[in-house]
Regions:
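A broadly conserved sequence feature marking short terminus-proximal activation segments
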Residues: 1-31, 141-142
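Well-ordered alpha/beta subsegment
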Residues: 4, 98, 103-142
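Residues immediately within or flanking Cys/His clusters that coordinate Zn2+
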Residues: 30-33, 47
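Cys/His-rich microdomains that often coordinate metals
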Residues: 42-43, 57
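Conserved hydrophobic positions within beta-strands
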Residues: 66-68, 105
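Short, conserved beta-turn/loop elements at beta-strand boundaries and strand-helix junctions
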Residues: 71-77, 124-128
Length: 142
């Protein structure tokens, strides 16, 4: 007989100097991206310089809206942090500001997810001092 173990919480992100502003904002319920001060391009994952022109970047609040670019449904996972969530959706979301973010879609049955659907950010606390962005269907687009 196999022994059932309690699910573990989702892993908390590890912040470094480049990502600390991002993770601090998510814990406050805000989504941030970097914007180039020279060309205005937005980017995420954080970097020291603009990917387009190598200019300086600054952190700006993102609106939290986006569109599903692609997704997959996870139906098997052996990690105690995720096994209890099965089935769950991992998606690439194109933020309205431009960057593409890998995330989980929540609040929707996996069979109802569609490429091109509008979603919005919400935040899940995963530890005392960390939250992660997840996305859910945007009711304004229904």
């Amino acid at each position: 007989m196999s022994q059932q173990r309690e699910p573990k919480p989702r892993p908390a992100p590890g912040a470094d100097p480049e990502t600390e502003p991002y993770w601090k904002a998510t814990h406050e319920g805000r989504l941030m991206v970097q914007r180039c001060t020279a060309c205005g391009a937005h980017q995420l994952y954080p970097r020291w310089r603009c990917l387009r022109c190598r200019g300086q970047v600054e952190w700006v609040d993102a609106g939290g809206g986006g569109t599903v670019y692609s997704f997959t449904v996870i139906r098997q996972n052996f990690s105690r942090s995720f096994r209890h969530l099965i089935p769950y959706v991992v998606a690439l979301v194109d933020l309205d500001e431009g960057p593409r973010l890998m995330t989980n879609l929540v609040g929707i049955e996996p069979d109802d997810v569609r490429i091109g659907m509008r979603v919005r950010a919400r935040f899940e606390r995963v530890s005392e001092d960390a939250s992660i962005p997840l996305f859910e269907p945007d009711p304004a687009s229904a």
